[in-house]
Amino acid sequence: MESPKKKNQQLKVGILHLGSRQKKIRIQLRSQCATWKVICKSCISQTPGINLDLGSGVKVKIIPKEEHCKMPEAGEEQPQV
């Protein structure tokens, strides 16, 4: 039987700490924490949000829950602002 500690380490739960004046966003994964740089605050649909460069070619957009944003299809290049 697995110990609860081992089971918890396998979960990857991200907690975002956002601040309107911050240029960086901290994402905490249980016991580990990393900070990523904000690269821009718009996307192709001009919906308010924050694009993050997570390194290794991974980019993520965070948008308000009530907003909808048309994200580019896989393989398309997103214009940088």
Curated annotation (Swiss-Prot):
Originating organism: Homo sapiens
Tissue: In normal tissues, highly expressed in testis. Expressed also in many different types of cancers: highly expressed in breast cancer, prostate cancer and many types of lung cancers, including squamous cell carcinoma, small cell carcinoma, non-small cell carcinoma, and adenocarcinoma, as well as in Ewing's cell lines, in some Ewing's sarcoma patient samples, and in one of one alveolar rhabdomyosarcoma patient sample.
Residues recorded with modification Phosphoserine: 20
Domain of life: Eukaryota
Remaining remarks: According to PubMed:11992404, the transcription of XAGE1A is regulated by methylation of the CpG island in the promoter, and four alternative RNA splicing variants, XAGE-1a, b, c have been identified.
Keyword Phosphoprotein in annotation: yes
Family per record: Belongs to the GAGE family.
Protein name: X antigen family member 1
Keywords: Isopeptide bond, Phosphoprotein, Ubl conjugation
Cross-link type Glycyl lysine isopeptide (Lys-Gly) (interchain with G-Cter in SUMO2), residue numbers: 12, 61, 65
